[in-house]
Amino acid sequence: MYIRSLELRDFRSWPELKVELKPGITIFIGRNGFGKTNIVEAIGYLAHLSSHRVSTDAPLVRANAGDARISAVAVNQGRELAAHLLIKPHAANQGQINRTRVKSPRELLGVIKTVLFAPEDLALVRGEPAERRRYLDDIIATRRPRMAGVKADYDKVLKQRNALLKTATIALRRGYGTEEGAAALATLDTWDGQLARLGAEVMAARFALVQDLSSQIRDAYQTIAPESRPAAVNYKTTIDQGLAQFGEFDAGIIEATLLTELAAKRQREIERGMSLVGPHRDDLELHLGGQPAKGFASHGETWSFALSMRIAEFNLLRSDGTDPILILDDVFSELDAGRREKLVGIARDAEQVIITAAVSDDLPANLADAITARHTVTVRDTDAGRISLLDEQPDTQP
């Protein structure tokens, strides 16, 4: 798979961008703050419907613009598809495939497949469980786009259930002794059933993915850092003890176990006003030689683990039959010679690679002969603010 053309309108610092791309390695060079990362962020957003830098859409829309637009034409095994996304910070986003508007932007998932490695990926190792859950859920949605809808439905149910636990605490505590309490508990029972059903689907998909990823991550880490301790991953849930008796993780068993645990934790949840059971509290545990990577990994080991997770993601998507687009956002300057060499080897073998760097000297020397296109990102200060430009010199006039 590769992107043949990319167009942006009012996306961050880009009032307009039109660029033709080819298979092979494309480089975007520009000083920090000039807007090169905004280009790859847009591609990643079109692929995953989320940014690797921010959690809301508002920062993606250029100042004083009402919305932003991302358009790309992707070529997959000779077939072209055009994906368009209109980002509205104060309304629902709109998606389009070729000339047909889709009911939900989630229908764009899978049209463009990317794996993005960026300095922010250190949070996969050092950050909170939410970072690692998102890592799993993004891969699942890329491979099985329907699951993005399941996850979105789960999040809605979770929000409603938490709202009930917070706002109806007194009624829930009174229980069936009052009409108000009985009604609140009946509503909670309804949310429990939906939380368990949808949560079981999410967790079953994560279990299956981790089973596929674990050996890939282990082998990638061993290749990147052969002198280090062995890497391992484990999906930890809030119902591990209940699942242990079954030894398998299909959705039916998970749903029944979730319902049992929800019943056991009900009083605690009412007292605390929050949902304590479900995939929203799970984690992908990372280990090095039996110790948690978070807190025990050195800086170099942290980079190696994060990189191995992205390599595993790339290899897994490739095994599904399509090379994802590999995006390397300003990472070569952060890596030592050994890790740079491993990454160059992967880049040379991928169908399309998009790399950003502050200066050409940040790029490994053994990458030069494989580069198919090189672009320069500059800026210009205007009355409407600073804007990014591609392959132009900045305006030096007062």
Swiss-Prot record:
Keywords tagged on the record: ATP-binding, Cytoplasm, DNA damage, DNA repair, DNA replication, DNA-binding, Nucleotide-binding, SOS response
**Lineage of source species:** Bacteria, Bacillati, Actinomycetota, Actinomycetes, Mycobacteriales
SUPFAM superfamilies of this UniProt entry?
P-loop containing nucleoside triphosphate hydrolases
Role of this protein:
The RecF protein is involved in DNA metabolism; it is required for DNA replication and normal SOS inducibility. RecF binds preferentially to single-stranded, linear DNA. It also seems to bind ATP.
Q: Its gene?
A: recF
Output the Gene3D superfamilies linked to this UniProt entry.
Answer: P-loop containing nucleotide triphosphate hydrolases (3.40.50.300), RecF/RecN/SMC, N-terminal domain (1.20.1050.90)
Do the record's keywords include Transmembrane helix? no
**GO biological process, any:** DNA replication
Family (UniProt): Belongs to the RecF family.
Q: Which Pfam families match?
A: SMC_N
State the name under which the record lists this protein.
DNA replication and repair protein RecF
* Organism whose genome encodes this protein: Corynebacterium efficiens (strain DSM 44549 / YS-314 / AJ 12310 / JCM 11189 / NBRC 100395)
Query: From the Swiss-Prot or TrEMBL record, what is one GO molecular function term?
Result: single-stranded DNA binding
Residues that hold ATP according to the record: G30, R31, N32, G33, F34, G35, K36, T37
Q: Which GO terms describe its cellular component?
A: cytoplasm
InterPro entries hit by this protein:
AAA+_ATPase (IPR003593), DNA-binding_RecF (IPR001238), DNA-binding_RecF_CS (IPR018078), P-loop_NTPase (IPR027417), RecF/RecN/SMC_N (IPR003395), RecF_2 (IPR042174)
User: From which domain of life does this come?
Assistant: Bacteria
Kindly list the places in or outside the cell where this protein is found, as annotated in its UniProt entry: Cytoplasm
